[in-house]
């Protein structure tokens, strides 16, 4: 148990509400569909993080009146760090600080928008992280999907501007300026478009029809109304979805 508490996985979680989804994501998929896609990505990331037996899990959650807890994500209602400042960079710094305050020696932040993240990569990050080494996982678009640090290395997050754009490159440059070695986990992709959504779907042998093509969604919208939204709020953590019929 002591070794498990030495490691902490951090995951930022937002409620399944359209106004809590990034504008870029809503532009790519439409407000309602973006909410469903984002929730499925969060469920997959949460399942991976919760199932990682070699660490404790810290969830940074921006609760709302409609979703004051995480029962929509997990019926066991896991505890969470309540977000005071919704700005992503502040949330990340607060989560890392709490992880170390509660006794963790290493903390690894994972981002849910990279659906091909593997637990093996998280293990590699924990093994590599030290006071002299930061672990960074990059997406093909230059953003980061994983960041592993010790308390000694939190200084690379002190200056604003590390979350957006080509953030993996920015973090790596900051680490090197602080005389840290950068350990890179395998490159993957962030799901931000129809193309990457299909890429994720096609990477699975069996996927359920959770992500219908916009035309299919339009055809079924009048029949289903708000039924899908209600199910999403009550959804339990599910295994990776099966591929929908073309």
Mark where each language-model region is.
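Conserved donor-nucleotide/metal-binding helix-loop-beta segment in metal-dependent transferases, i.e.
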Residues: 116-141
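Conserved alpha/beta core of the MobA/IspD/sugar-nucleotide pyrophosphorylase nucleotidyltransferase superfamily
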Residues: 173-246
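Short aromatic-hydrophobic micro-motifs that form the base-stacking/packing surface
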Residues: 108-110
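Short beta-strand/loop segment that forms part of the nucleotide-sugar
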Residues: 54-63
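Short, glycine-/small-residue-rich phosphate/pyrophosphate-handling segment
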Residues: 153-172
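Short phosphate-binding loop-to-helix
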Residues: 69-106, 195
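A short, N-terminal amphipathic alpha-helix
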Residues: 37-54
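N-terminal nucleotide-binding beta1-loop-alpha1 segment
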Residues: 1-25
């Amino acid at each position: 148990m002591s070794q498990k508490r030495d490691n902490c996985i951090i995951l930022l979680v937002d409620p399944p509400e359209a106004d809590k989804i990034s504008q870029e994501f809503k532009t790519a998929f439409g407000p309602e569909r973006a909410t469903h896609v984002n929730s499925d990505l969060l469920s997959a990331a949460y399942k991976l993080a919760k199932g990682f037996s070699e660490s404790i899990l810290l969830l940074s959650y921006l609760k709302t009146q409609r979703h004051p807890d995480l029962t929509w994500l997990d019926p066991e209602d896991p505890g969470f760090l309540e977000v005071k400042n919704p700005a992503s960079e502040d949330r990340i710094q607060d989560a890392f600080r709490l992880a170390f305050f509660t006794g963790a020696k290493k903390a690894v932040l994972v981002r849910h928008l990279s659906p091909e993240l593997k637990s093996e990569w998280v293990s590699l990050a924990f093994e590599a992280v030290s006071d002299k080494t930061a672990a960074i996982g990059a997406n093909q678009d230059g953003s980061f999907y994983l960041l592993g640090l010790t308390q000694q290395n939190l200084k690379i997050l002190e200056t604003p501007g590390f979350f957006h754009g080509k953030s993996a490159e920015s973090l790596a440059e900051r680490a090197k300026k602080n005389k840290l070695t950068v350990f890179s986990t395998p490159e993957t992709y962030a799901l931000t478009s129809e193309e990457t959504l299909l890429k994720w779907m096609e990477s699975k042998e069996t996927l359920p029809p959770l992500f219908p093509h916009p035309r299919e969604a339009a055809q079924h919208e009048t029949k289903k109304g708000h039924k899908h939204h209600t199910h999403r709020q009550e959804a339990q953590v599910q295994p990776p979805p099966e591929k929908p019929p073309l």
